[in-house]
Amino acid sequence: MRFRVDGTLREVVQPNRALHAALISRLKIMADLDISEKRLPQDGRISLRLGTRAIDVRVSTLPSAHGERAVLRLLDKSESKLSLEAVGMQGETLRRFEGLISQPHGIILVTGPTGSGKTTTLYAALGRLDATRNNIMTVEDPIEYELPGVGQTQVNSKIELTFAKALRAILRQDPDIIMIGEIRDFETAQIAIQASLTGHLVLATLHTNDAASAVTRLTDMGVEPFLLSSSLLGVLAQRLVRKYCSHCHGSGCEHCGQTGYTGRTGVFELLVTTDAIRAQIHNQASEADIRTAALADGMALMREDGERLIAAGVTSREEVLRVTRD
């Protein structure tokens, strides 16, 4: 049994193998899954309350050579009041990103691998916007935190409620701002771009390695370059690095489980779509050319942002090198 804490796996305990079937069955009962079905993957959820904290547990089971595996993802509903500063955004990146989310229309992308904090950043961005003066709507899978004053919709594959179908319905709900949990296909990308061109501010996540590759990823999906160049406001790429333990500052102690780290913060790379970059996108420039143009316009790479954290004594060089590339 292993826990992923601050992005790294730790073995916690090795239960007796004889307990395996009973543990899996109990989890499946709690998650309202079919305990007799052992041949197919299943997904479910468990809602728990620990004191005043509401915990949502996402359960995924998968058959394997040695029996079923189960992975549990914990979502603490009480941690919804996040700010951009709390996720680690500072200085010029914060100022420029706030400028992007204050625009009346266009699309902003937040990109990175799974577990890099993209959705948390989107929630923090929505928290900056006035939900009383704007009709803010989201489509997510799953809804990770409940936001007051925001209309949140969760996709449901069992009834064929996809991102694209939910987005079409949301556009009939008079939204000002739309948040899309993830752009997974051309249909979703197309609706998102069209929404941003018709007077809506759209915020969405995408799975790419850096800011420049988000542009080529969308064009590879089939989005027309002239539409993307007209609608894209900017791309924020990010990773999470572990922070030094405040008690031992990296040497390892009982407070951090001898790892030297507790908690995480973000390193960011913000590409703002200037006229020069719009021209590059329109002309179907390569990823390298778009990155070069962005650097000329003042974009700082994630590794450079990480250097700031190293200099401030927040994290180690090894951590920054672990999650970023040249």
Tell where the protein language model's regions lie, with residue ranges.
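Short, flexible helix-loop junctions that flank or precede catalytic/ligand sites
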Residues: 1-326
